[in-house]
Amino acid sequence: TEIRSAHDAIAAGIGMVHQHFMLVDTFTVLENVVLGTETGFSLQESMQKTERELQRLEKDYHLEVDINAVINTLPVGLQQRVEILKALYRGADILILDEPTGVLTPQEADHLFRILNELREQGKTVILITHKLREIMAITDNVSVMRQGEMVAHRKTSETDREELAELMVGRKVLMQVDKAPAKPGSPMLTVKHLDYIDDFGVRRVKDVSFEVHCGEIVGIAGVSGNGQSELMEVITGIKPFQKGQIQISGQTITSTVRADAATMRRFGMAHVPEDRQRRGLVTSFSANENIILGYHKNPSYNNFIEMDRDFIIQSCKKQMEHFDVRPDNPHLRASLFSGGNQQKLVVAREFERDPALLVVGQPTRGVDIGAIEFIHRQIIAMRDAGKAVLLVSVELDEILSLSDRILVMFDGQIMGEILAKDADEREIGLLMAGVRKEAA
């Protein structure tokens, strides 16, 4: 069968569950499933037919969900289930899932794997696109490895291991475990007290949040995406104003009336690696050397307030690209022409090289290869060991567990609990991520 469009793929029995769900938030489950497949003389007839078929699919594949629920009232785990139902309703025999656990709690991920095993047992083919080696080893029968757009290896999962797969993905041996000494926390560098943030639509996204980050430690914030972590980070870094509470950094106090923008926060000793490198971290149409000074272009070493010292900027960019292994190491190359991993290393190079007192890092390894992940993790730990305070926000629970000294868990804009990393239990964190407090668990 020749496939030239999504319609051709669906007709050939191929279904796709995208990393970012393709659902209409204000429609019900039933309306989302029937959308685009309407048959018969009336919409009501189509809905009745779809409802009967959905009830059968739910029973056959243990995909229970309230078909009359509106999508935006469902947790992400159930929204993903709706995407699977949509694909099965359209007759999918081959189901492709792209990074399916990126937005799930550990408990939701386990439930997804049970569903995928059920699909396999009933004769469906499941293709999992993921960079999470633990998941590959846990659920797959066969694994193929792509590197730089080429298929470089095929293995039976039972005949390989995480170390070999990582080496195949990167082209060299990769250190799988983060090696770090115990933290030696010093005085508080960042103190957040009773912080509230209300967005432009009047929704309270951050609710009475308080915590500290000390010099020489990494504090990780865990949580399913969309629970206020992004807004908290943007408030702390001066991108968004807040309505209540206070932030103290390097002895400076910021309140809802005594405000500080992102440039002021940088002067206070804060560096920020934003979670969306292309929207917040880079101007992709600019060259590498122009991006390497973004936000720091008024630095006297770059700028004598009459003109920019281009030669110095280019030489400085070359050194930083070499130190942070940015490839290709061409300071004149446009940022859009670098791979995602090298774009991220460009942002990391710019922020880490400023010798900040406080480093705020959002999703540091999103969309980067395992080799770049290893490198960025080493750099974060080196900053901690140099006595810097690090606030790490990530939806990757493995990353939070391996890098953090203390872990805060956010749900619905609130801090649900604090756990020492050495005592952390993945199941307990998963419950907190789902809004279940420890005493209620």
Predicted regions: what they are:
Residues 1-441:
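Glycine-rich phosphate-binding loops of nucleotide-dependent enzymes
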